[in-house]
Amino acid sequence: RDGIEPWLERMSGVIKHLTRYADIICWQTTDLMKTGSQFIEPTGFHSIRLFADANYRPLWIRVWKMAGGAPGAGPLQLASTKPAPQFDTVLAFAGQEIEAYNDQEYSWVSAFASHAIQFVRRLTRDERRKWGYAGVWEIPAIRRDKDSEPQIPVELPWRCLKMHSDMNGMILDPFAGLGTAIIAAEQSGRVCRAIEADPLRCDLIVRRWEQFSDGKAEKVEA
């Protein structure tokens, strides 16, 4: 279905469950272009409202700039003024104070930070310099061809996991997609529990994980 109402209905339920179990939630959104009208729907702004209803506030907002070649003009762009996707919004949400920064090592932060979430200690100095403090993350998107929808690179969830989780920590992914967050968790030494409604995608996720890890997936009967 087109329009924002189906999206709001689905996401409100997802966010309600996520906020029951996750202290920090990293949320990547793409503006909704297929709305049945000339208007778009900025899902990042709608997400902030849905999380606010669950008493979760944004820790940060970043832009994922899909570095690489120029996007092609698909049927939607040719029939409207709606742009081809070149960026997504990435947000991190949390409830009240979860962690505390090291006041001695990062005393200067206290003059500017309005929250007590510390992710800096999990990153190396080089990671902090290259992307830890950046508001725009330039990471190439994965495209099968110039007209295809961009796929999320492993680097994107990997950065979020590095910032907001520790080794052997539990990661929840309600939209597994092609298993990108699962691969990122495998790379960074985290444990991922993921959900995907599409059986075909589940098969792709299993094959992708096996190719990456050289392991053998086991089916567990419920």
Label each PLM-derived region with a short phrase.
Residues 210-222:
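Conserved phosphoryl-transfer catalytic core
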Residues 165-168, 209, 213:
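Alpha-helix capping/termination and helix-coil
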Residues 200-211:
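Short alpha-helix adjacent to the SAM-binding motif of class I
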Residues 1-202:
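Core catalytic lobe of class I
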